[in-house]
Amino acid sequence: MEKKEKVLAAADPGCGRVPVNKIIPFSAVDGPGNRTAVFLQGCNFDCRYCHNPETRNLCRNCGSCVGKCPKGALFTDEDGKVRFCPEKCCGCDTCIHVCPFGCSPRIRMMCAEEVFAEVKKQQPYIRGITVSGGECTLYPDFLEKLFVLARGAGLGTLIDSNGTLDFEKYPQLLAV
């Protein structure tokens, strides 16, 4: 397992948004019982055996994927950044396969309330949520906010992590 020198994903400090790679509304393999799984983008490791390698780095905006998307779900904005239109995406992963950096451009910057709104749609059918990645503990403030919302709704919470966060520095996260 190699530790990266630089973490490429960073939360937007102004509004608390983090890069969300995907939300799986119903999962029976990401923890006990039926749950919603939330995958965040960015990791501080570069493991060869990574289960979700496309979640390690943020898109570098090289644009290699834009013309290759069969559904036109990717475009370059006026600032030269690759943008993603989830409504058009068919989930074929062409963008990931053609990326020279193995990144996924299919992220949405979301705050805890927006993610929980997606989770809440599944509440009658799930027992909890699992947040994974990438490395979800790169975003401890986001996790705390999301878990407060989930616990308040009676849902269990799990973190799927590489274990590098010093939880003693985040007692409020452990208290949730």
Regions found by a protein language model. Name each.
Residues 58-174:
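Conserved Radical SAM active-site core
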